[in-house]
Amino acid sequence: MAKKSMIVKALRKPKYKTRQKNRCKLCGRPKGYMRDFSMCRICFRNHASAGLIPGVSKSSW
């Protein structure tokens, strides 16, 4: 889990646009971020497996 201070810091508008770091809306994880869903890969996998994200299904071939 991300530190609470880092999550709050990421929510503030940065002075320069290049300093912005995307974070997961659910857990605050900065890495493995998926822009389309605004969450990290771990939270995405959990929500997709539970069927909480409409239109997403497990692929198999």
Curated annotation (Swiss-Prot):
Pfam families in the record: Ribosomal_S14
Cofactor comment: Binds 1 zinc ion per subunit.
Required co-factors: Zn(2+)
Binding site for Zn(2+): 24, 27, 40, 43
Keywords recorded for this protein, A-Z: Metal-binding, Ribonucleoprotein, Ribosomal protein, RNA-binding, rRNA-binding, Zinc
SUPFAM superfamilies registered for this protein in UniProt: Glucocorticoid receptor-like (DNA-binding domain) (SSF57716)
Assembly notes: Part of the 30S ribosomal subunit. Contacts proteins S3 and S10.
PANTHER family in the record: 30S RIBOSOMAL PROTEIN S14, SMALL RIBOSOMAL SUBUNIT PROTEIN US14M
Function according to Swiss-Prot or TrEMBL: Binds 16S rRNA, required for the assembly of 30S particles and may also be responsible for determining the conformation of the 16S rRNA at the A site.
Protein family: Belongs to the universal ribosomal protein uS14 family. Zinc-binding uS14 subfamily.
Protein's UniProt name: Small ribosomal subunit protein uS14
Biological source species: Borrelia duttonii (strain Ly)
Chain's gene name: rpsZ
